[in-house]
Every structure is written in structure tokens, then in C-alpha cells.
């Protein structure tokens, strides 16, 4: 039986409208809580790539094996590695290249759901690995594998740098990164390794285990904020917050805030009141228009923009927080050169009241590097879940220079029967 599904996407990115400091383990750790840095195009620039145990038959978009899914369960039809370093012996153990990046870069995320064997990681042509140990430990908690940090007590990384099966431990390298997995390909070996590839001239200082001691103050500061951003976040603005309060009638579009620039918003907090709150959060459209553009750089249902949907679902993160009382906060900075307007478009059939505030901050707009924050939404109705009628769902088409910072996806499935795999 087919099942109709609605797919709702909110996509956020910054778009572009000196001389860089060296990239170090410390600078990358500090960047994890530096939302202000997103206002300008990165220098040096980079692209992000991912090495993974995906089914390597899936190499031609729209081809016959595009949706092949033997992605690390073992005994894949096509080996899911970059190359074979050493063929397996009688015990079935071989050595396989799972990541190879030439040029300056940084590992920024690793993940596994299950993997046996060991990993060796080499930097910059060195013959001795900087890491040689458990693959599972490295892909879940890289920093912890290098031993205890002097002067640091407690589970510093758990729930902050390390979250469930993924880890966000920055590991930079100057010239090259090679990672070899030693294991049995007939056994489960799920892995993902996400790497920033910087432009060739980038000045990057290669990671050393001693960095964790050298930058322990940065680690402790970042860990504290990541553990509870809503409570521990520090805003840099010296300006006063500006209140928002409005009641929007059905069918009305109301301008609820206007600011002159150049400035940036460091915080946007809103709370919606309505008889049917779930409907109001979906049917009230948030628009943020910077510098008199003909349409808003931000256009999204208000609840979806903050990641609250459906209804109010509390969570606490650096870019967004949704509190149990319905207060929704965005910490993505929103720079503008001349003006900023916030409009609320009530497309529902009942009045909606919205309260909140913005925190403006000083900002110097640079025509070469400054970027507007953008977030757009789209809905695909009546999708059919079928193993025969599979299809790709392109959700971002962008031109020019910019930095992609995230996507929120909501699936509305009318089928009451739970299915394996979610």
C-alpha cells in the first residue's frame, strides 16, 4: 500500500554579497562557538568532502545502482574503500585506505555505528602514525584516544564534542592525511570521515596529541558552552535588545521590526501564541529582508525556521534553542549593510500573537567578504514511499560564493504502522 508523505525543508546558508591567521587545532576549536565568523566568507576558503563506507556501486546519478545500499554491512559486491594497502591473509585481515587527502585540511567530523579492527592515521608523509589503535574508539571519540588532558577532570567531551555515534574533534594537517583501516571486510565496518580541504596556499599547523594540553583552556570553554548553549552562551553585543510584540490577523502581513545598518543581529528570539499553536507555527511565515532586497533572505514557517516543528519540541543547541515554554531562539548572525526588516505573514484562519526580541550588534559591512544569512523552505506533497519508484529529492540549488550551514527536514507520514528503519 502506498503512503503519501509530505517533505518540508528549511535550508540555511550564508551568501557573499587580509591575510588569514594560521589554522591550528586551537583556532578550529574556538571556531566551534564563533558564530560571528560566519558573517564573512572564510579566508582561506575550503570545501568539505566526506569519505565513507557507502556502496561504491552508487557512482552514477540516475544509474542502475544509484540506490545500492551495501554500505558497510560486510562482504560488499564492490569494496567500499579508496584502495587496498595489503590484501587479506588467511585470517581475513587486510589493510584498506579509507581516507586520503593531499594538501592542507582538517578532519572535522567522524562517525561509526559499528566497526571492528584498528586504524592508523598518518600526516604529511610521516612513516609513523600519529594514531594507531581501535577503529571504534577513533571514530566515536578521537580526542579521548590520545589520553587524559592534565588539569581537566570529568567527561569533558561527552555530549559536547562527542555526541552519540559522531565526534566533532577538529584535527588539522598541513600537507596530507592518510587513514588506513585494518580489519576483516566480511564483518561490519561502517565509517564516515568528513574533511575540510583548504585552498593550496592555506597555512595549516598539523595536529599533535600535545595540542590537547596546549589548548585545554579553549577546550574547557567550548565544552562548557556546548553542554548548555542557552545558559552559557556569551553575546558580544554591547547594545540593548529590541522588543517585538504584534498580533497578526488572518491574511495579514505585518512589519514587526525595522533597523538601520550597518549592523548584525546576534540573537533572534520569538514566541507564538494561538488557539491552535501547531497550525500557527506552520502557517505563520517569517520573512527577514536585508538591504531592500525584493524578497526576504529568510522565508520560512516560523516554527520550521527554529527547528521546533511539528509544534513545540524543546532542544538546546548553538544555532537554535527551543525552550519548553515555546520561546524559540536563533543565534545565527544576520549582518546587513543598510537595513533589516522582519515581517510576519499569517496564512492561517485565526489571529496569531508573536512576542520576542532581537539583539543587534555593531558590524562593518565589507562588500568583498560580508554575507547575508539566508533560509528558504519548500514543501513536497503526496510523495509515495516505494522501493520501486525511488527518486532523489534535490533541496538546494545555489549559485555564487557562500557557506552552507545546515538543513532541517520534517517528514509527515500518515501511515499509523511503524516501519523498520524509521
Regions from the PLM with identified roles:
Residues 1-2:
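N-terminal secretory signal peptides that target proteins for export/translocation
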Residues 6-16:
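Bacterial N-terminal signal peptides
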Residues 21-422:
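Beta-strand-centric surfaces of beta-sandwich/beta-rich domains
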Amino acid at each position: 500500500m502506498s503512503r503519501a508523505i509530505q517533505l518540508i525543508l528549511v535550508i540555511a546558508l550564508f551568501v557573499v554579497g587580509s591575510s588569514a591567521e594560521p589554522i591550528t587545532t586551537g583556532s578550529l576549536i574556538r571556531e566551534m562557538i564563533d558564530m560571528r565568523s560566519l558573517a564573512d566568507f572564510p579566508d582561506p576558503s575550503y570545501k568539505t568532502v566526506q569519505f565513507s563506507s557507502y556502496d561504491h556501486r552508487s557512482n552514477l546519478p540516475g544509474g542502475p545502482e544509484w540506490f545500492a545500499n551495501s554500505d558497510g554491512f560486510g562482504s560488499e559486491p564492490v569494496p567500499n574503500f579508496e584502495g587496498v594497502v595489503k590484501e587479506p591473509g588467511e585470517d581475513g585481515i587486510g589493510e584498506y585506505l579509507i581516507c586520503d587527502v593531499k594538501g592542507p585540511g582538517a578532519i572535522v567530523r567522524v562517525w561509526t555505528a559499528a566497526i571492528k579492527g584498528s586504524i592508523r592515521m598518518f600526516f604529511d608523509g610521516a612513516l609513523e602514525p600519529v594514531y594507531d589503535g581501535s577503529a571504534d574508539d577513533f571514530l566515536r571519540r578521537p580526542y579521548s584516544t590520545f589520553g587524559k588532558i592534565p588539569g581537566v577532570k570529568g567527561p569533558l567531551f561527552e555530549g559536547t564534542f562527542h555526541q552519540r555515534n559522531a565526534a566533532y574533534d577538529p584535527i588539522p594537517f598541513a600537507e596530507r592525511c592518510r587513514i588506513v583501516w585494518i580489519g576483516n571486510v566480511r564483518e561490519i565496518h561502517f565509517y564516515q570521515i568528513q574533511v575540510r580541504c583548504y585552498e593550496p596556499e592555506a597555512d595549516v599547523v598539523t595536529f599533535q596529541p600535545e595540542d590537547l594540553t596546549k589548548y585545554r583552556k579553549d577546550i574547557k570553554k567550548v565544552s562548557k558552552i556546548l553542554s548548555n548553549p542557552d545558559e552559557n552562551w556569551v553575546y558580544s553585543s554591547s547594545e540593548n535588545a529590541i522588543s517585538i510584540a504584534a498580533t497578526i490577523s488572518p491574511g495579514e502581513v505585518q512589519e514587526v521590526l525595522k533597523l538601520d545598518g550597518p549592523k548584525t543581529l546576534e540573537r533572534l528570539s520569538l514566541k507564538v501564541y494561538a488557539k491552535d499553536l501547531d497550525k500557527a507555527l506552520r502557517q505563520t511565515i517569517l520573512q527577514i529582508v536585508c538591504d531592500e532586497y525584493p524578497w526576504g533572505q529568510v522565508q520560512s514557517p516560523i516554527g520550521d525556521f527554529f527547528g521546533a516543528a511539528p509544534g513545540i519540541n524543546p532542544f538546546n543547541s548553538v544555532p537554535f534553542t527551543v525552550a519548553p515554554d515555546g520561546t524559540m531562539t536563533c543565534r545565527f548572525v544576520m549582518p546587513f549593510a543598510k537595513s533589516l526588516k522582519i515581517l510576519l505573514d499569517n496564512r492561517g484562519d485565526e489571529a496569531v500573537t508573536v512576542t520576542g526580541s532581537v539583539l543587534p550588534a555593531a558590524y562593518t559591512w565589507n562588500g568583498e567578504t560580508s554575507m547575508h544569512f539566508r533560509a528558504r523552505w519548500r514543501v513536497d506533497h503526496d510523495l509515495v514511499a516505494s522501493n520501486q519508484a525511488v527518486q532523489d529529492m534535490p533541496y538546494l540549488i545555489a549559485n555564487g560564493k557562500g557557506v552552507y550551514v545546515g538543513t532541517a527536514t520534517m517528514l509527515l507520514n500518515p501511515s499509523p504502522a511503524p516501519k523498520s528503519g524509521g
